[in-house]
Amino acid sequence: LETGGTGPKVRPVVACKGTTCQYGLIDTVAFSRTIHERFYKGWHDVRLPHKFKIAVGGCPNNCVKPDLNDLGVIGQRVPSHDLSKCRGCKVCQIEKACPIGASRLGESRLDWNEEMCNHCGRCVGKCPFGVVGEEKRGYAVYIGGRWGKRTAQGRMLAHVFTSEEEVLEVIERALTLFRDEGSAGE
């Protein structure tokens, strides 16, 4: 990757170490290189209303803060739950594995708060009775983040994308919309 980039253009892509980390769910290095080639280099001569920053994080731990960039990508491992298999163990491995408390043992079985779940996937396969499996792996895309004097967390699109091509298309559309409709300094 090349360093540098100034002015109202796509900036160099930032990424965490991805799959070389124990929590990495996607190959951030390879994917950020693809994004870099297509948008940093490919859009190098395209003037935008303001700089445009892109970050790729391998998991929901948010180490490189993708949600605080104009566009951020975060690896996802969406769990599937079959709560009918839950036996209400008093030593629930799913509850122990969940770093944010989205899964808790209730009076008789596991309670899963889907709204709270960040799709880190640490609970997948932890239950010996097969309560939690993997529904899909993919990418969450955040748009509209900002870092600096005025910080704003980007909004996650309401869909977990399952291929890099889908994400690249979202980036292309976001950049095209920003180029055509964005305001200077926005």
Regions found by a protein language model. Name each.
Residues 1-91, 111, 116-118:
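Small-residue-enriched alpha-helical segments and adjacent helix-cap loops
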Residues 91-112, 122-138:
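Iron-sulfur cluster-binding cysteine motifs and their immediate structural context
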Residues 29, 33-36, 95, 168-175:
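Predominant activation on well-ordered alpha-helical scaffold segments within soluble catalytic domains
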Residues 137, 145-185:
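A hydrophobic, small-residue-rich beta->alpha segment in the mid-to-C-terminal subdomain
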Residues 5-10, 94, 137-149:
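A glycine-rich, aromatic-flanked flexible loop/lid motif
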